[in-house]
A protein has these predicted regions:
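An N-terminal-biased, well-structured beta-alpha scaffold segment characteristic
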Residues: 1-98, 206, 226-228
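Conserved N-terminal Rossmann-fold NAD(P)-binding element of oxidoreductases
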Residues: 11, 155-157
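Glycine-rich, N-terminal phosphate-binding loop of Rossmann-like dinucleotide-binding domains
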Residues: 12, 55-56, 79, 208, ...
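Short, Asp-centered acidic motifs that coordinate Mg2+ and/or phosphate
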Residues: 50-51, 74, 210, 238, ...
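Rossmann-like adenosine-cofactor binding region
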Residues: 60-64, 182-279
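Rossmann-like dinucleotide-binding domain for NAD(H)/NADP(H)
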Residues: 93, 97-98, 111, 222, ...
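Phosphate-binding beta-alpha-beta segment of Rossmann-like dinucleotide-binding domains, i.e.
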Residues: 101-153, 165-168, 179-182, 187, ...
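Hydrophobic/small residue at the entry helix of a nucleotide-binding pocket
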Residues: 162
Length: 329
């Protein structure tokens, strides 16, 4: 590897082992307080950094990128999704963008199944009865009844790495696998999962018992689950989202939950994080969690290792392995 040590600015606190390695390899400026950078701080960072390492909480938009100095040549995103970055503007200014695909697949798929179980079996409600409410009066044949998931139809929106991993887990639980994607997956994968492809999202939504959102947030998927589409779902159906909050019309979802027009929702992501739609907070049939889907020690370290490899490869004069291309957006 080249002995040159580029100035790398990291916007958030990363696992200690990752930060230690980055300090060894690069001229690294860390965020010791883990306080999210404001707009002014981000603008200052891009004026001096050769490499910027942002996270999902950092909005690297055109306004920020237009203030970047000529030395900024790589944005090594600490995350799989790149909807926090104006990739088109970055590329037009000769800035390479990378992400960390693959390493969060299993963790997010595990969490998706946990949300399905939490909503279907009312697990969070039960925990509150024992804990915060302390109102449990003993077992009853008709108390706290949820729904069996075995044999139900699961509709997966977005059959990429995470969607496919969810399907494998769901099949083991006895769910029938259905999916909507830009195109069908490989026939061998369909055969393995006994999965049914739906070209029409509308038709799939109307027939599913459970819907799992696993697609990225892009201009094409912004509020993909609109009020009109949500109304197509069965009254007793549930929806879980471990992708991005922007994919669902949150106000429409809240209205339907309030009116009893949906069986429940499990949400780990929100459109205006960390703010959460007040109507969702009041919805009795909603399980709301603070963007924990990929939150494992192993996953965060793996993400950091991906970032380091991307930076090292770039320093050595090669294309980073996880370069984001226009065709991927």
């Amino acid at each position: 590897m080249s002995k040159r040590k580029p100035l790398v600015v990291v916007t958030r606190k990363l696992p200690d082992v990752v930060e230690t390695r980055m300090m060894e390899l690069f001229n690294t400026r860390l965020n010791a307080t883990d306080t999210p950078m404001g707009r002014t701080e981000l603008a200052e960072a891009v004026k001096t950094a050769e490499v910027l390492v942002p996270t999902v909480t950092d909005r690297i938009d055109k306004a920020v990128l237009m203030q970047a100095g000529e030395q900024l040549k790589l944005i090594a995103n600490f995350g799989n999704g790149v909807d926090n970055i104006d990739v088109e503007t970055a590329l037009s200014r000769g800035i390479t963008v990378t992400n960390t695909p693959g390493v969060l697949t299993e963790d997010t798929a595990d969490f998706t199944m946990a949300l399905i179980m939490a909503v279907s079996r009312r697990i969070i409600e039960g925990a509150k009865v024992i804990g915060a409410d302390n109102s449990w009066e003993g077992w009853s044949p008709t108390w706290m009844l949820g729904h069996r998931i075995g044999g139900k139809r699961l509709g997966i929106i977005g059959m990429g790495r995470i969607g496919t991993a969810v399907a494998r887990r769901a099949k083991a639980f006895g769910l029938q696998i259905h999916y909507h994607n830009r195109k069908p997956v490989h026939p061998k994968v369909e055969e393995e999962l006994e999965a049914t492809y739906w070209e029409s999202l509308d038709q799939m939504l109307a027939r599913m018992d459970i819907v799992s959102v696993n697609c990225p947030h892009t201009p094409a998927t912004y509020r993909l689950l609109s009020a009109r589409r949500l109304k197509l779902m069965k009254k007793e159906a549930i929806i879980v989202n471990t992708a991005r909050g922007e994919v669902i019309d949150e106000n429409a979802l809240a209205r339907m939950l309030e009116a009893g027009e949906l069986g429940g929702a499990g949400l780990d992501v929100f459109e205006h994080e960390p703010a959460v739609n007040p109507r969702l907070l009041k919805a009795k049939k909603a399980v709301l969690l603070p963007h924990m889907g990929s939150a494992t020690i192993e996953g965060r370290i793996d993400m950091g290792e991906k970032v380091i490899i991307n930076i090292k490869t770039w320093v050595d004069g090669h294309n980073p392995p996880d370069r984001v291309l226009p065709s991927m957006l």
